[in-house]
UniProtKB/Swiss-Prot annotation:
SUPFAM superfamilies: Coproporphyrinogen III oxidase
Gene this protein is translated from: hemF
Binding annotation for a divalent metal cation: H97, H107, H146, H176
Protein name stated in the entry: Oxygen-dependent coproporphyrinogen-III oxidase
Primary localisation category: cytoplasm
EC annotation from Swiss-Prot or TrEMBL: 1.3.3.3
Signal peptide location: none
Length: 303
């Protein structure tokens, strides 16, 4: 490993530890179970899963560091000049699915890629972000989530949050449904526009911001009473989450195409999901308001 890779790996392992500790404390019941694994083609990781807690129905916080002789198609499709290069990929990826329909699902990811070829300069880039998927929308939560995202981006330029917020809105979009997966946040990829140290500092700012963005929302909503019908709606909306991850998500596709660990890759899927044929929310209901108001391309900070 190069010194850069070592520095990124040390940060990601520490980030995984800190996020798991914070989520365990907030749940107050369940503990993460670690499954360390080795990839035959090169590398390995630490999968940590939690479930059946007081707050978290299912969740996972994964670290992986894999390498190989050639980039898989999902990683080189938009950069064909990198096809055939050897690669290293490091990242932390997490998804948290709470029981309570009033607590949104959250997702975060930070990652680092290096593509190398003998006799040529190594090409590196970072990617990541975090996004929120509510089932019953709350404006206070949406504003808080985006405010933390904006504050994390602010030291790196006034244009960074608007650019990566818009990218998130475009990326987490179910084309076949014509709707977004959630209320967005930040998404970026192929980040090497600054020098390495600045890009690495930005990744740390985003990774460190996740807990500050998510835990206050969990704390506000976890004790909100809910009905069996609201739970059913949560499971119905979770179906959209499954559809996106299996059809569009670049991280899922990269993992499967690169021979990654299937159990860890599919850890993001919720435990209870339902699909109903041509289901429609009642006009004027909270369920209808989710798509009509919250799942829209909206400037939550009023900028």
């Amino acid at each position: 490993m190069t010194s850069r890779t070592e520095a990124v790996k040390a940060y990601l392992l520490d980030l995984q530890d800190r996020i798991c500790s914070a989520l365990e404390t907030e749940d107050g019941g369940a503990r993460f179970v670690e499954d360390a694994w080795v990839r035959e083609a090169g590398g390995g990781g630490r999968t940590r899963v939690i479930g059946d807690g007081k707050v978290i129905e299912k969740g996972g916080v994964n670290f992986s560091h894999v390498f190989g002789a050639g980039l898989p198609p999902s990683a080189s499709a938009h950069r064909p000049e990198l096809a055939g290069r050897g690669f290293e990929a490091l990242g932390v990826s997490l998804v948290i699915h709470p029981y309570n329909p009033h607590v949104p699902t959250s997702h975060a990811n930070v990652r680092f890629f290096i593509a190398e070829k003998e006799g040529e300069e190594a090409v590196w880039w970072f990617g990541g972000g975090f996004d929120l998927t509510p089932y019953y929308g709350n404006e206070e939560d949406c504003v808080h989530w985006h405010r933390v995202a904006e504050q994390a981006c602010a030291p790196f330029g006034a244009d960074v949050y608007p650019r990566y917020k818009a990218w998130c809105d475009r990326y987490f979009h179910l084309k076949h449904r014509g709707e977004p997966r959630g209320i967005g946040g930040l998404f970026f990829d192929d980040l090497n526009e600054w020098d390495f140290d600045t890009c690495f500092a930005f990744i740390r700012a985003i990774g460190d911001a996740y807990i500050n963005a998510y835990l206050p929302i969990v704390q506000r909503r976890k004790d909100t009473p809910y009905t069996p019908q609201q739970r059913e709606f949560q499971e119905y909306r979770r179906g959209r989450y499954v559809e996106f991850n299996l059809v569009y998500d670049r991280g899922t596709l990269f993992g499967l195409q690169s021979g990654g660990r299937t159990e860890s890759i599919l850890m993001s899927l919720p435990p209870q999901v339902r699909w109903g044929y041509d289901w429609k929310a009642a006009p004027g209901s909270e369920e209808a308001r989710l798509t009509e108001y919250f799942l829209q391309d909206r400037d939550w900070l009023g900028q």
